[in-house]
């Protein structure tokens, strides 16, 4: 490898762990392998897990979140711990067409119901 070629080791510095905190949602992650994030660098990213959509809001916790894997105490080691400096609070939303047909109705969400967001 020549001295002018980029090093792959620099990509390691760009890794950031993020805690996702879901509000008003009962989501079974075990059955939701299909996952994507739109606008991760924006103030309100959109997260899709399976067929459900969530609108995120970034929060900076005081200190650092420590995520501990669900394992037996005897198996716990420092290698399994994850440190996170940012938290993404997620609220479930419902996407609606920008120009809905007259037959469809859009209503305001009630407490615990997903917010309607127009598709761009």
Swiss-Prot record:
UniProt-annotated location(s): Nucleus
A GO BP entry: transcription by RNA polymerase III
Major site of localization recorded for this protein: nucleus
GO molecular function: RNA polymerase III cis-regulatory region sequence-specific DNA binding; RNA polymerase III general transcription initiation factor activity
Matching InterPro entries: TFIIIC_triple_barrel
GO cellular component: nucleus; transcription factor TFIIIC complex
Start-end of Polar residues biased regions: 101-120
Keywords assigned by UniProt, alphabetized: DNA-binding, Nucleus, Transcription, Transcription regulation
Source species, domain of life: Eukaryota
Positions of region (Disordered): 96-120
Assembly, per entry: Component of the TFIIIC complex including sfc1, sfc3, sfc4, sfc6 and sfc7. The subunits are organized in two globular domains, tauA and tauB, connected by a proteolysis-sensitive and flexible linker.
Record's function text: TFIIIC mediates tRNA and 5S RNA gene activation by binding to intragenic promoter elements. Upstream of the transcription start site, TFIIIC assembles the initiation complex TFIIIB-TFIIIC-tDNA, which is sufficient for RNA polymerase III recruitment and function. Part of the tauA domain of TFIIIC that binds boxA DNA promoter sites of tRNA and similar genes.
Protein name as catalogued: Transcription factor tau subunit sfc7
